[in-house]
From Swiss-Prot:
<feature type="topological domain" description="Cytoplasmic">
    <location>
        <begin position="289"/>
        <end position="305"/>
    </location>
</feature>
<dbReference type="InterPro" id="IPR017452">
    <property type="entry name" value="GPCR_Rhodpsn_7TM"/>
</dbReference>
<feature type="topological domain" description="Cytoplasmic">
    <location>
        <begin position="206"/>
        <end position="227"/>
    </location>
</feature>
<keyword id="KW-0675">Receptor</keyword>
<comment type="similarity">
    <text>Belongs to the G-protein coupled receptor 1 family.</text>
</comment>
<feature type="transmembrane region" description="Helical; Name=4">
    <location>
        <begin position="132"/>
        <end position="152"/>
    </location>
</feature>
<feature type="transmembrane region" description="Helical; Name=6">
    <location>
        <begin position="228"/>
        <end position="248"/>
    </location>
</feature>
<feature type="topological domain" description="Cytoplasmic">
    <location>
        <begin position="44"/>
        <end position="50"/>
    </location>
</feature>
<feature type="glycosylation site" description="N-linked (GlcNAc...) asparagine">
    <location>
        <position position="9"/>
    </location>
</feature>
<feature type="topological domain" description="Cytoplasmic">
    <location>
        <begin position="113"/>
        <end position="131"/>
    </location>
</feature>
<feature type="transmembrane region" description="Helical; Name=2">
    <location>
        <begin position="51"/>
        <end position="71"/>
    </location>
</feature>
<feature type="transmembrane region" description="Helical; Name=5">
    <location>
        <begin position="185"/>
        <end position="205"/>
    </location>
</feature>
<keyword id="KW-0325">Glycoprotein</keyword>
<comment type="function">
    <text>Orphan receptor.</text>
</comment>
<feature type="glycosylation site" description="N-linked (GlcNAc...) asparagine">
    <location>
        <position position="5"/>
    </location>
</feature>
<feature type="transmembrane region" description="Helical; Name=1">
    <location>
        <begin position="23"/>
        <end position="43"/>
    </location>
</feature>
<keyword id="KW-1133">Transmembrane helix</keyword>
Length: 305
């Protein structure tokens, strides 16, 4: 992928294929199961809820991205890209678009839940279902009008690339303007993630102090527990890549040779961001009665000791 060196020496390639193939198979299977599972749950959810709209948009983002995963797997298995360079750019860009749109919807969901907690409200929702549809449509129109043309016109267009070798656009990072934009994105994502984590720690500790031993009997706690799923995915899937991205940008800017280990770690961490596709499966699984009962049993067991 995106971190491959474009020189004739392909020594960066073999060490990546096996690891990435396994990861993307997990992403494809887990993502599809999660999409199917959440569809049954969405039928019962309030269609005017802001959180529900964010979840529906997550379904769309994951669904579009999962359509590109089989092409990545085909390239990893065959070792040759046969779908044309323009489509390669689209598939490559979709991994990044998916990551940042998913992060955006996580932020929306968490901010709404935090507002509910601090303002002591039962829910935050649109006045009409039409308003919810209009808000989502406006967001997607913005993505289609701004993001897609930007990707088509700028992504991977500054250098020459081999049409049979895909996801090797790291030379674009040699341009100062591209690196500056990347640094800015990294800083914003890390800062927002840490702020959300701080709020979640504060809320969780407040609830523990308030309810103590009766913590698990309050619905408010279970609502906040779902927040931990999203926070956990941000910490596990997104932040490692963002932190390593800072070092990777520096290496690409100051080195002309292939850095095996740097390219390897960048690709592995980038591919782990796609594991966020399994979030819907965790969301459904975490809301099941069986899981709640197991958590209650474990909590009671800890109190006994």
């Amino acid at each position: 992928m995106d971190g491959y060196n474009t020189s004739e020496n392909s020594s960066c390639d073999p060490i990546l294929a096996h690891h990435l193939t396994s990861i993307y198979f997990i992403v494809l299977i887990g993502g599809l199961v999660g999409l199917i599972s959440i569809l049954f749950l969405l039928v019962k959810m309030n269609s005017r809820s802001v959180t529900t709209m964010a979840v529906i948009n997550l379904v769309v983002v994951h669904g579009v991205f999962l359509l590109t995963v089989p092409f990545r797997l085909a390239y990893l298995i065959k070792g040759t890209w046969t779908f044309g360079l323009p489509f390669c750019k689209f598939v490559s860009a979709m991994l990044h678009i998916h990551m940042y749109l998913t992060f955006l919807f996580y932020v929306v969901i968490l901010v709404i839940r935090y507002l509910i907690f601090f303002k002591r409200r039962d829910k935050v929702e649109f006045y009409r279902k039409l308003h919810a549809v209009a808000a989502s449509s406006a967001m997607w129109l913005l993505v289609i009008v701004i993001v897609v043309p930007l990707v088509v016109s700028q992504y991977g267009n500054s250098e020459e690339y081999n049409e049979q070798q895909c996801f090797r656009f790291h030379k674009e990072l040699g341009h100062d303007s591209v690196r500056v934009i990347n640094y800015m994105i990294v800083i914003v994502v890390i800062a927002v993630a840490l702020i959300l984590l701080g709020f979640q720690v504060f809320i969780t500790l407040s609830m523990v102090r308030k309810f103590r031993h009766s913590l698990l009997s309050h619905q408010e706690f279970w609502a906040q527990l779902k927040n931990l799923f999203f926070i956990g995915i941000i910490i596990i899937c997104f932040l490692p890549y963002q932190f390593f991205r800072i070092y990777y940008l520096y290496v690409v800017a100051h080195s002309k040779s292939c850095k095996n280990k740097v390219a390897f770690y960048n690709e592995i961490l980038l591919s782990t961001t796609a594991i966020s596709c399994c979030d819907l499966l965790l969301f459904v699984f975490g809301g099941s009665h069986w899981v709640k009962q197991k958590i209650v049993d474990m909590w009671n067991c800890l109190l006994c000791h």
